[in-house]
Design a protein with these regions (language model features):
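Bacterial N-terminal signal peptides that target proteins for export
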Residues: 2-11
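Proteins that catalyze or organize thiol-disulfide redox chemistry
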Residues: 27-73, 80-96, 113-117, 121-127, ...
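A fold-wide structural signal in alpha/beta-hydrolase
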Residues: 107-109, 258-260
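Bacterial N-terminal signal peptides
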Residues: 12-22
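Intrinsic disorder/low-complexity signature
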Residues: 2, 26-27, 109
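Alpha-helix initiation/capping motif
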Residues: 1-2, 19
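Active-site-proximal cofactor/substrate-binding loop regions of enzyme domains
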Residues: 102
């Protein structure tokens, strides 16, 4: 603030300068703005506490990750004074859903590209961190390298990526899309999704409008229920809407369900099928959900039948819809058993039928 005895001319010039700046001008520390300062930081950036405390024997780290039920190992190559690393750690790993998803699927080990700790690589070769980074061609920071259960590199992400693309990269590896398609193709499959704006969920007319009173514990409903747990800026959600949910046959099946769409991170009130009053966020947390979109199917009495918590396409989604509509779970107990024995030939019953 200017002191009171500052000259009127100087104060006027200052006010003109302030007014000349557009109100919507992005902050200089916003990495997505033209004014972002990418010079080395003045203060070092720290990696999250949940990163693995490692002796940098990478094969041992991978073995431990797989033993814990994870997809593989994620190496984070960074520097202490790297502004792009700071942006990734704060903007991407600073988001609750990204952190939860990453921790569920990967152990993350940090490599300082200027460090001197000894690293034992997947082949047993021992080098210092700095040389290891050179050998791995991690010349730009941050660089993320993913290793799968065969101890081979399956994907790398170089530089900073906004949360939307970063989530997509994690999903691309965790769901093993690298086995069948390039990351470019995986991203392109979401281009047909309908967005009202960047911060909204996708919309379809088969969703019931709020308030969501889903209680089925006192009175049996006439139709099964499917709840879509989603989140904003969700690449996998966009893929679902651009693909399976734009298919006429899929939509015909879905319109025979009661269908509800929830933002799994919102405080929107909801009454669950069991009659519990809660919020979308609290319900998703109680269900242990970490992936979006997750589709949970309930029968007419409010009992969960099954859930889809990974990327799903036409064949599988339509199969699950038929499985629930035909009440195949009553006879076969599981979707896979139903699929093997009846799913290929069993049509969904007419609306209201109860086989």
């Amino acid at each position: 603030m200017r002191r009171r005895n500052a000259g009127a001319r100087l104060l006027g010039a200052w006010l003109l300068l302030v007014l000349a700046v557009p109100a919507s001008a992005p902050a200089a520390d916003d990495i997505m703005s033209p004014g972002f300062d990418d010079r080395p930081l003045q203060e070092p950036v720290e990696t999250p506490e949940w990163f693995k405390l490692s002796f940098l024997d990478l094969h041992d780290d991978l073995t431990e990750a797989l033993a814990a039920g994870k997809r593989g190992l994620l190496l984070y190559f960074g520097q202490k004074y790297c502004p792009y690393c700071k942006a990734l750690l704060e903007n991407d790993f600073g988001k609750q859903d990204i952190t939860a998803y990453t921790r569920h699927h990967f152990d993350v080990v940090a490599i300082d590209t200027r460090g001197n700790r000894l690293v034992t690589d997947m082949d047993g070769t021992i080098t210092a961190e700095a040389q290891f980074a050179v050998d791995q061609k991690a010349s730009l920071t941050p660089t993320l390298i993913f290793y799968d259960d065969s101890a081979r590199e399956v994907f790398r992400l170089v530089g900073y990526h906004p949360p939307y693309q970063f989530r997509a990269a994690l999903e691309y590896v965790a769901d093993r899309h690298y086995r069948t398609e390039t990351f470019r193709h995986y991203l392109a499959r979401a281009e047909g999704a309908l967005h009202l704006d960047e911060g909204t969920l996708n919309h379809r007319d088969f969703f019931s409008a709020p308030p969501h009173m889903l209680d089925r514990s006192h009175f049996r409903a006439q139709r099964p229920l499917v709840v879509f747990f989603e989140q904003r800026n969700c690449h996998a959600c966009d893929v679902l809407y651009a693909g399976p949910l734009s298919n006429a046959a899929t939509l015909r099946l879905l319109r025979r369900f009661d269908a509800v769409q929830l933002d799994m991170w919102s405080d929107e009130p909801v009454v669950t099928p069991a009659g519990r009053r809660t919020t979308a966020r609290a319900w998703a947390q109680r269900l242990g959900l970490y992936y979006a979109p997750t589709l949970i199917f309930y029968d007419e009495s409010g009992q969960e039948v099954m859930r889809l918590a990974s990327v799903v396409h036409f064949y599988r989604l339509q199969g699950v819809l038929r499985y629930v509509l035909s009440k195949g779970y009553r006879q076969y107990g599981s979707f896979q058993r139903w699929r093997r024995r009846a799913g290929a030939s069993a049509p969904a019953p007419a609306s209201g039928a109860d086989p």
